[in-house]
Amino acid sequence: MAGGEKRRGLSKSCALLIVIAGIERYAFKGVASNLVTYLTDVVKMSNSRAATTVNTWSGFTFMLPLFSAPFADSYWDRFFTILASSSLYFVGLVGLTFTAFAGSRSTTKTISLYFLYTSLSLVALGLGVLNPSLQAFGADQLDYDLDHDNDHEPSSENKEVKSNRKTQFFQWWYFGVCAGSLLGVTVMAYIQDTFGWVIGFAIPTASMLLLIFLFLCGCGVYVYADPDLKAKPFQRILEIIKERVCGRNKITLVNDHDLNAMELELQDQKPLCNCSNTEANTTTKSLPDDHKSCKTGFSGLETVKLLLRLLPIWTMLLMFAVIFQQPATFFTKQGMTMKRNIGPNFKIPPATLQSTITLSIILLMPFYDKILIPIAKKLTKNEKGISVKERMGIGMFLSIIAIVIAALVERKRLKISKMMKTTPNLDPVSILWLLPQYILLGISDIFTVVGMQEFFYSEVPVSMRTMGFALYTSVFGVGSFVSAALISIIETYTSSRGGKHNWFADDMSEARLDNYYWLLAFTSAISFLMYIVICKHFKSRSDDDDQCDTNC
């Protein structure tokens, strides 16, 4: 920057992409947070089928980045990937709005399940490609800022400045996502309950159109990766596997220092620029063929190792994702049976309680940054206060406490319902009793979800950044499938013993969601203990960097 002036805040491109991410969350939460109510009340699905449908749809939505990321990292231009996927997202929302409109105009009040599933699939496909590409594109803007702003930094301060700016970016990104989620859950749930589903789905559709417009408005401020220098990590992986199988290329991995050097070489391979980088392009093209071949095989093997070593921690995070499926499904169904009146004329829409998760994040994030982290820095002598792995572990523990509280509240609700013999699906227990479990999930979100984003961002090569974000979202995708499978297995087993034993009975006075919550708490506790053991033996790349700095 001119005169060596150092910019403290985020660039215009980063800020614009954070706003765009917030709008996307507003549209998504406006549909997803109350979808189970739409499926049970309008489409007339059973509780278990509606929950399974929502979980399966969420699973596809969060799993698709795993399949799109290799193409986005190796072949697709991120700008046009974002534009195409957001357009597909918009078309899906248009279709969903049409299903609500057709249902409201039909004399039989029936909705075509085929058209409904097609619309939801288009939304899932668009979102599955959009989210990791948008985050990776934002990280590209951040890298450009760091590379240029830190040219004037002393080398001893460079690492700490970069670390703090990365943390700032992820926290502001998550703040934008939370703000959009909060508006989507509160405003849209009220509109859907009060004015109907046509308007309730039309507003998120209009929001996606606004997102596309704003994204195009930023063309002049974005920085782009040079397409001639775009790394193709997955192509290298396939090449090295082919060479290994055919026995045509024998590669020897030397030591950890060589691996670190190769990773630095990979990072320098993909500059970000506002124009073509002729010098860098010439340098890359002038590399000898033997060197290119060696680098291709070498980095391919190391990339496979980097991905496989993340698998144990990725697996242990799945039960956290299963717990996080509950607010949009069974927590909402719980709230529909409870006393929701505030005054004589207003009823709390059950889906709006999901906003307390987001409110908890927004209100407590400053406490986390300004009070908790400085205290932790003094106690641990760590520049971040607590490590990313510790941050994720704390959130996992809090999510277990939240689901235990949910089980206790549900058991109390059932007990009061049976004692007072109330009307089915209408209990005198206030819906506000559900607040503690929502708030605790919000606090756990601050620790685990932000920690997951930073963890997978930091542990993959820069040329596979979209894949890093895809690994983060895939935790929730597979977690959704696990949740759907659990519901199907439990319902099959419990319903075979008679209607009164069905944990997911449509009559909430007969359902045993408390038993389901206890099962989730038990399995999550086992997963948490295994996570602790795995983390003790896991050596992160940041640890390697710290050791390298010490040796130097």
Swiss-Prot record:
The chain crosses the membrane at residues 16-36, 51-71, 82-102, 110-130, 169-189, 195-215, 311-331, 356-376, 390-410, 431-451, 470-490, 515-535. Expressed in shoots, roots, stems, leaves and flowers. Belongs to the major facilitator superfamily. Proton-dependent oligopeptide transporter (POT/PTR) (TC 2.A.17) family. PANTHER family: OLIGOPEPTIDE TRANSPORTER-RELATED (PTHR11654). Disulfide bonds: none annotated. This is Protein NRT1/ PTR FAMILY 5.8. Keywords: Membrane, Phosphoprotein, Transmembrane, Transmembrane helix, Transport. Induction: Down-regulated upon nematode infection. The keyword Ribonucleoprotein does not apply. SUPFAM superfamilies: MFS general substrate transporter. One of its GO terms (biological process) is response to nematode. The modification Phosphothreonine is found at residue 81. It is a multi-pass membrane protein. One of its GO terms (cellular component) is membrane. Gene3D superfamilies: MFS general substrate transporter like domains (1.20.1250.20). The gene is NPF5.8. The lineage of its organism: Eukaryota, Viridiplantae, Streptophyta, Embryophyta, Tracheophyta. The keyword Ribosomal protein does not apply. It is found in: Membrane. InterPro entries: MFS_trans_sf, NRT1/PTR, POT_fam. GO terms for molecular function: dipeptide transmembrane transporter activity; tripeptide transmembrane transporter activity.
